[in-house]
């Protein structure tokens, strides 16, 4: 199988507290997934699930405790041994478009600096032509961009500018960490539609990190659902979100707002102040919230089970698969 990015058993452990009360939290726990060329892969889950920490390790901002990251593609060749550096092949955009740019600098300077750092143009004329090309790709023009400060743009425009800057190096992989969460609702679809356009027209792959299942469903080819450092379900987005197998995925799915003025958003999702406890749980980390939890769930870590093209980390399906295999043996 042709893959662009492979994450293999990635783990990140943080030590919290003082010397006498130090606790080790596995913020990312044995996470594995891959991204194919010309694919949008979503890494989704609620705040604190470990998705951003995973992205930071892929980008080299955090050192993994263990595991491997391999990026294939780009002029840097194959990068491994736990880090993928910012090269021509891998670029990123982040949650806050206003925090990306210094308010006292015109945005042009960021583009010219990137071009200079990577040697992307022989002279100023070539640089301007390259900037125009990338701005046009995200629906902007050089005239409306040149000489302006970040405060002169809307959040949606700044996020498009961030994407255009990332495209300067012709990356094969774009890591987008909550790229629409701080953009007006009316502009969110324009950003996710841009990802789809770039995938279809230039073969760009996107690792789309989000808590928003609605945009994940719309834009992604495959999706992984994270909970307390674990991937609990992964597969084609249509299968995972329209017919969720893991109890946590079902809970997230039910929390998506409906066209009902009497129903408050999130009224079905039960969130408690147990994040710390869930990270330290001996068995399944979701057992404290799960309506199907058994004593086994509370004491033993579930293994990955493959149901057709969907991966599920749940004792319920592990026992079902054992029963099925036993019946086949008897037959």
Residue ranges, per PLM feature:
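The feature captures the beta-strand-to-loop junction immediately N-terminal to the Walker
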Residues: 44-46
């Amino acid at each position: 199988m042709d893959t662009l990015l492979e994450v293999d058993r990635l783990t990140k452990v943080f030590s919290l507290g003082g010397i006498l009360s130090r606790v080790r939290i596995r913020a990312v726990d044995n996470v594995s997934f891959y991204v194919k060329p010309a694919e949008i892969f979503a890494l989704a889950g609620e705040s604190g699930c470990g998705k951003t920490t995973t992205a930071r390790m892929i980008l080299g901002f955090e050192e993994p405790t263990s595991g491997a990251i391999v990026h294939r593609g780009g002029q840097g060749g194959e990068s491994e041994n736990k880090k993928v550096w910012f090269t021509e092949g891998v670029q990123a955009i982040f949650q806050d478009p206003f925090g990306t740019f210094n308010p006292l600098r015109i945005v042009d300077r960021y583009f010219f600096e990137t071009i200079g750092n990577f040697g992307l143009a022989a002279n100023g004329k070539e640089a301007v032509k390259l900037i125009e090309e990338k701005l046009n790709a995200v629906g902007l023009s050089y005239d409306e961009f040149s000489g302006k400060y970040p405060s002169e743009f809307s959040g949606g425009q700044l996020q498009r500018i961030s994407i255009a800057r990332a495209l300067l190096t012709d990356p094969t992989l774009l890591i987008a960490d909550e790229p629409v969460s701080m953009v007006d609702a009316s502009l969110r679809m324009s950003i996710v539609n841009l990802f789809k356009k770039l995938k279809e027209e230039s073969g760009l792959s996107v690792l789309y990190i989000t808590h928003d299942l609605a945009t994940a469903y719309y834009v992604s080819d495959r999706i992984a659902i994270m909970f307390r450092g674990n991937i609990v379900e992964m597969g084609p987005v249509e299968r995972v979100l329209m017919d969720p197998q893991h109890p946590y995925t079902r809970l997230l799915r039910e929390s998506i707002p409906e066209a009902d003025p009497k129903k408050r958003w999130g009224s079905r999702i039960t969130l408690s102040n147990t994040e710390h406890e869930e990270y330290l749980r001996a068995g399944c980390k979701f057992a404290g919230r799960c309506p199907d939890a058994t004593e086994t769930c509370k004491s033993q870590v579930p293994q990955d089970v493959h149901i057709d093209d969907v991966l599920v980390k749940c004792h319920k399906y592990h026992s079902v698969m054992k029963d099925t295999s036993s019946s086949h043996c008897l037959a």
